[in-house]
Amino acid sequence: MFIGRTRELDTLNKLYDSDKFEFAVLYGRRRVGKTALISEFIHGKKAIYFMGVESNEKQNLENFSQSIMEYSSGNIMQTSFLSLQVALEYVFELAQNEKLILAIDEYPYIARSSKSFASTLQMLIDKYKDTSKLMLILCGSSMSYMEDHVLAYKAPLYGRRTAQMKILPFDFEETCAYFQKFSPEDMALIYGIVGGTPQYLLQMDDRISVEENIKNTFLNPSSSIYEEPENLLKQEVREPALYNAIITAVASGASHMAEISTKVGEETSVCTRYLKNLIGLGIVRKETPYGEKESRKSLYVIADHMFRFWYRFIPDNNSIISRGAA
């Protein structure tokens, strides 16, 4: 059952109802429900859905070709287009006379495998934007890539989008829709522990206590949540070890830059750069006292609920949890 995202669906449906070319950019952290949102939106509509893979250009071209051919003929074909440009132009041509959605999920994987993909898209958008009824959706989980290579001023696709949505975790009210049997107090506890990320909420069972849920997930080495924060960092940053150290320092109570620098054992200039990236990822938040300009009084706190809980309790007890003694 699909829950929430009413505002996002309304925006996408308004774009779909227009009689002209539309280009929406969706981005947000992994597990936040971007793919589920796209699936819900395109259900019952004429759409080509293609998810990029972390492979080479040839593999992505073959997969893209299959998605197009399956839409066009209803069958999986054993042939591929000559190039990604030819495949894209074919889709733009299909949308000359009718509304058609092309949803490209995990766009960064494709763009990294084909250095000319963004420029090719730019060229085709400029060529067809006045005649095509295509609704193009680019979706990505690498927030830094989407912001720097799709939304940024110097990006080839800058100025072409007609909408952009940063998909965020649910707030508390939306989170409550996932649970029917938790008491209000337990729902508040669950939200405080895992936040509003759909993938984590789906692993919480309202038929058992909050304590049992913690044991089944955070304290269970076979659970996907057990190593989730570290896995997410590895997908987003190049030096996860130092990021881990900084997050651990903040989660354990170091809130001022000098304290963080001392705990981590790095210069403040280094910590500042890494903290800036963590803020961009929505993992850390910088708070400045009311009436003060940004200064040494600024505090750093863990913004993400699940990261805060995990880094506060799991690393220090890893050996106990690993041997099943938690």
Model-derived features with residue positions:
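Phosphate-binding site recognition
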Residues: M1-A325
